[in-house]
Amino acid sequence: GMSGIASTTYPSTDEAMLGAEAAYAGMEAELQDYLDTYESTHSYDEYHFDLDEIGHDPYVLISILTAYHQGEWTLDEVQGTLDMLFEKQYILTERVVVETRYDSEGDPYSWYICYVTLENTDLSHLPVYIMGEEQFSMYAVYMATLGNRPDLFPQSQYPNASQKEGYLDYDVP
């Protein structure tokens, strides 16, 4: 079988892993932009936003992809998985309520109120729902070792990235 160190190390190329992280971060940036420009691109009378923060830990992403695909993968191979994860992580709800209001003459008019909600189910909460037992234990091992690649996502560039020592006393919310 695999030697201990090999089975705890991410098997995919840096190009694939950095590419998957960039693709996922790109989807998040698009969502952020959609929300940031919401009022200027929609024409309702009133807006109410209830938005979770957008973001993820790149080590969680790569550990999920590696465990889910049970080994090495290319960016092409995980494109569908990235979409699936994104749809599970972010639930965007847009609801419009129309109220009848009356002007100073007492004439009725419609007032459109838009409620926008973004729910972020942290990426680290998804493995238990999408993986079998074997995949899940692979995921846990990769997270414990950070795939033996603490250099892959430096905190300076990836503020949400796990750090090796910090992981061990990480509390599950």
Feature roles, as predicted:
Residues G1-V172:
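Membrane-proximal envelope biogenesis segments
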